[in-house]
């Protein structure tokens, strides 16, 4: 999208934090328990349970599966493999992309056939470590080239407000590209992140809504800006070379410009780690929605997993533009369905926020009960018999369990 798209990504993040709060709070309110005790939820679930339209929930689930299992996962596979271009410029022609794609498929298969808990362990270790290291590299690159920073920001803002470019063809303008890339980076409003938010065990839905809002700032304002600043510094230093690069090779050369060859190796590993963890997370989103449509189909789930692995291999060896175009199309349809749902249901998230704020003002650790909001459509969780699920050990539950014990237990 060019340098100016970064500015519109920032604005998208600020607006998106609000929609991320609403959709993730709704996902928590209408989450359900799986057979193994895990929580599942997301737009498909709150559309069915709160709006009463299962057909619309199924439509959303199908769109999410197409977007994440086949659009975004193809893009992530491409990103991971394109990092090889620095080492082998013709990697796609000589079969190396196919080998790398098969390796990705094998690594992903070991996780998706191993269950959700293994997903959590891998992503919770890999992502924070690599994110912190990535930020450190970006800070070093920025500080070591501080004299070029004003020129980099000048290019960014000049491009962002190039009105001839903006209004010359709005659908392909810097604003639209910034919005689409911002939506891709933080998912806010699309209805994908709520699938992850619903799995959390918290004492109040609003707690997870606030966490999801924060995540929007972390990934778009912090992580993506790190990439942008490194690339823009490289661009103003050597525009002829920068213009000829795309995707991961552009980021690799931007780091090489400041850190040296070691920086390229780090970026290669970091991008592979980010892309791999994203493949796993995206698959989990898709599987949660597949289970919504076909809750009891074990054979169907096996076939679905195989199809997802084929999509990863396909993305690894196909073009950059195709991956982005598929992702953009499905992403737009997902957002339309989900935004309509959160406009209709947003009042319940705001009432939950009022309940949370009231408890916080009294110095309490907020605990949510569905009965605290009059008229709230039926929920599977958040009733008194589920207090033990909340994880905060409310006094009422403790006393009820203690009355049958001896005095020491009650004390």
Residue ranges and their predicted role:
Residues 3-10, 45-49, 53-61, 92-96, ...:
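Membrane-interface alpha-helices at helix entry/exit sites of multi-pass transporters
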Residues 1-37, 219-226, 264, 332-339:
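Extracellular loop-to-transmembrane helix junctions
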Residues 21-31, 137-155, 163, 167-169, ...:
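Extracellular/periplasmic helix-exit of transmembrane alpha-helices
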Residues 78-84, 95-145, 149-157, 290, ...:
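Membrane-interface loop-to-helix entry segments
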Residues 3, 71-81, 108-120, 140-152, ...:
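Transmembrane helix-loop junctions in multi-pass membrane proteins
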Residues 1-5, 20-51, 237-258, 288-293, ...:
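Flexible loop linkers connecting adjacent transmembrane helices
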Residues 12-37, 43-44, 48-78, 82-111, ...:
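Helix-loop-helix module between adjacent transmembrane segments
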Residues 339-411:
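Terminal cytosolic tails of multi-pass membrane transporters
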């Amino acid at each position: 999208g060019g340098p100016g798209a970064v500015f519109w990504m920032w604005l998208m993040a600020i607006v998106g934090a609000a929609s991320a709060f609403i959709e993730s709070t709704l996902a928590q309110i209408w989450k359900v328990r799986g057979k193994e005790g895990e929580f599942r939820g997301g737009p498909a679930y709150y559309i069915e349970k709160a709006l009463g339209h299962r057909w619309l929930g199924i439509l959303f689930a199908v769109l999410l599966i197409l977007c994440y299992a086949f659009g975004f996962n193809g893009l992530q596979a491409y990103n991971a493999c394109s990092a090889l271009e620095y080492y082998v410029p013709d990697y796609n022609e000589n079969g190396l992309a196919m080998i790398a794609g098969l390796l990705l498929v094998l690594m992903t298969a070991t996780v998706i056939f191993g269950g959700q808990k293994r997903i959590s362990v891998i992503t919770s270790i890999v992502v924070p470590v690599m994110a912190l290291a990535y930020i450190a590299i970006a800070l070093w690159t920025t500080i070591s080239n501080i004299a070029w920073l004003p020129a980099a920001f000048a290019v960014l803002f000049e491009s962002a407000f190039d009105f001839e470019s903006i209004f010359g063809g709005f659908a392909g303008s810097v604003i639209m590209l910034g919005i689409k890339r911002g939506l891709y980076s933080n998912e806010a409003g699309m209805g994908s992140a709520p699938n992850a938010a619903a799995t959390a065990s918290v004492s109040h839905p609003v707690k997870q809504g606030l966490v999801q809002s924060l995540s929007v700032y972390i990934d778009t304002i912090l992580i993506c800006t790190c990439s942008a600043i490194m690339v823009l510094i490289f661009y103003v230093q050597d525009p002829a070379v920068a213009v000829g690069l795309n995707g991961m090779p552009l980021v690799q050369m931007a780091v090489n410009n400041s850190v040296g060859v070691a920086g390229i190796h780090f970026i290669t590993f970091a991008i592979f780690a980010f892309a791999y963890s994203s493949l796993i997370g995206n698959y989990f989103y898709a599987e949660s929605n597949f289970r919504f449509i076909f809750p009891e189909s074990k054979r169907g789930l096996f076939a679905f997993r195989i199809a997802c692995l084929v999509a990863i291999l396909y993305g690894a060896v196909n073009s950059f533009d195709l991956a982005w175009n598929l992702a953009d199309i499905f992403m737009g349809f997902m957002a339309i369905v989900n935004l309509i749902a959160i406009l209709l249901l947003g009042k319940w998230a705001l009432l939950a926020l009022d309940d949370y704020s009231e408890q916080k003002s009294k110095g309490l650790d907020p605990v949510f009960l569905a009965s605290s909001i009059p008229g709230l459509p039926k929920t599977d969780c958040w009733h008194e018999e589920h207090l033990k699920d909340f994880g905060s050990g409310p006094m009422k539950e403790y006393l009820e369990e203690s009355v049958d014990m001896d005095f020491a237990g009650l004390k």
